From Swiss-Prot:
Its main location: cytoplasm. GO terms for biological process: regulation of DNA-templated transcription. This is Probable transcriptional regulatory protein TWT_266. It comes from Tropheryma whipplei (strain Twist). It comes from the Bacteria. The keyword DNA-binding applies. GO terms for molecular function: DNA binding. The keyword Transit peptide does not apply. NCBIfam families: PRK00110.1 (NF001030), PRK12378.1 (NF009044), YebC/PmpR family DNA-binding transcriptional regulator (TIGR01033).
Length: 252
């Protein structure tokens, strides 16, 4: 998502090598399988699956891999998909909090791996609910900067398109585009309203948004960033969200 966005998740600013790309593919395939299992194989009727497929395509996952993942997840191949979704809460220092979103087939392995990284970083895992109140779950739709006719979008045009779809906010991104913030349950209605108005969007995503952000001096800031990067390397981790603000933090 746009680097000008105020909705901060973690974006790592370094090249992705082949090994990391393969790991990312595996995570995205897992996300598709779980979404298909939960809501069925129809993208039009399953916003979670549509979001997972869109994210996979954005990261160049081959269409054949995506199709097979949908079939596996929806039970069409007879394979058993047994992943669970978990969110771990991490207390850092000076008011910094993190939510680590995981998708795993082994809770014990997942928890042990997260705890090891967090402890090495001088931070701690806390009980569910201890820090989650610092964040809200939100859906974000990133728009193209032009409509289907090639005209630059205006905020009035976007607003009129989604007026009935119950959005929370429309945020200019600084590159002539906009982001629409909405409740996750309203994402399907928002996307349908945009399509009906001829407005194209780049991505749809559900994220944890901090209620407020915290700044740290450089040394402590770098420690948090290193921990986040280590967490993102875990096979079980789907996303890391924090209330820390800084140069390395931007929406995907």
């Amino acid at each position: 998502m746009s680097g000008h966005s105020k909705w901060a998740t973690i974006k790592r600013k370094k090249a992705v090598n082949d090994a990391q790309r393969s790991k990312n593919f595996a995570k995205l395939i897992r996300l598709i399988e779980v979404a298909a299992k939960q809501g069925g194989p129809d993208l039009a009727g399953n916003p979670g699956l549509a979001e997972a497929v869109q994210k996979a395509k954005k990261n160049s996952v081959p269409n054949d891999n995506i199709d097979r993942a949908i079939k596996r997840g929806s039970g069409l191949t007879g394979e058993h998909i047994n992943y669970v979704s978990l969110v771990y809460e991490v207390k850092a220092f000076d008011g910094v909090a993190l939510l680590v979103e995981c998708l795993t087939d082994n809770k014990n392995r997942c928890a042990a791996g997260i705890r090891s990284i967090v402890t090495r970083s001088g931070c701690s895992m806390v009980n569910p609910g201890s820090l989650a109140y610092n964040f809200k779950r939100k859906g974000i739709v990133v728009l193209q900067d032009r409509d289907a006719n090639g005209n630059l979008l205006s905020e009035d045009l976007v607003l009129s398109a989604v007026l009935e779809a119950e959005v929370d906010d429309i945020v200019p991104t600084g590159d002539c585009g906009f982001e629409i913030i909405a409740e996750p349950s309203n994402l399907s209605a928002v996307c349908n309203a945009l399509r009906d108005s001829g407005i194209q969007y780049r991505s749809v995503e559900t994220v944890y948004v901090p209620n407020s952000t915290v700044s740290l001096p450089e040394q402590k800031y770098d420690r948090i960033i290193r921990m986040i990067e280590a967490l993102e390397e875990s096979d079980d981790v789907q996303g890391v969200y924090t209330n820390l603000s800084g140069k390395d933090l931007a929406c995907e």
